[in-house]
Design a protein with these regions (language model features):
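Short secondary-structure boundary/capping segments
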Residues: 5, 39-40, 90-95
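Signature for the C-terminal beta-barrel architecture of outer-membrane proteins
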Residues: 30, 50-169
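Phosphate/oxyanion-binding active-site loops and adjacent basic polyanion-contact surfaces
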Residues: 2-5, 9, 42-49, 146-153
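Beta-barrel outer-membrane channel/assembly domains of diderm bacteria
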Residues: 1-26, 52-55
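Short acidic, glycine/Ser/Thr-rich loop/turn "cap" segments at secondary-structure junctions
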Residues: 7-8, 32-39, 80-83
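Aromatic-lined, polymer-binding surfaces characteristic
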Residues: 22, 27-50
Length: 169
């Protein structure tokens, strides 16, 4: 508990540019196909204040080489977490989710989140690139104490049955 008179949870301000939505706010996110649980992001914890970029309308690529992916969606965000932590105060929290519907009723998604930077840790574009590309994983020429962040990755598949009103996740 704290002495704050109010919270901004669930609020945001957004603008649209082409097929992209840019927003600032504290939006709850539920990443995963399950209705009762999510492996990577859920509304179990309070939302982090973030800057987000989302694809507004899910449409297939126009090129014949990528059209088979079907309608696709991308969302990414970055925000700064709170201080007074046991690890590093004020780390950045980054996430990205890409989903596609190659067939009617079938959705495939890939998700990734990472905590990086924070007080007392390096925070450069190289650090972000090493995290994004997987070059910073412990055991990959990086000692655990030098690993610049904590990462999670997930994938999920959701299929809506053409018979009845059944969904499988």
């Amino acid at each position: 508990d704290d002495d704050r008179p109010g919270r901004l949870d669930g609020s945001y301000v957004a603008g649209k540019f082409g097929n992209w939505i840019f927003s600032l706010g504290q939006q709850e996110r539920w990443w995963g196909s399950g209705w009762e649980g999510s492996l990577i992001l859920s509304n179990n914890a309070r939302p982090v204040p973030t800057f987000s970029i989302d694809r507004a309308v899910s449409e297939p690529f126009e090129t014949k080489w990528l059209n088979w992916i079907g309608p696709w969606r991308l969302t990414t965000f970055v925000g700064q977490m709170e201080g007074s932590r046991d690890d590093y105060d004020h780390p950045l929290f980054w996430g990205m989710r890409v989903s596609a519907r190659p067939l009617d009723g079938l959705e495939i998604s890939l998700e990734r989140t990472a905590q990086l930077c924070g007080e007392g840790r390096s925070c450069t574009w190289d650090d972000f690139w090493n995290m994004f590309s997987g070059n910073d994983n412990a055991g990959e020429n990086v000692d655990p104490e030098d690993e610049p962040g904590n990462q999670l990755a997930s994938w999920d598949i959701r299929w809506a049955s053409p018979i009845g009103d059944w969904n499988y996740a």
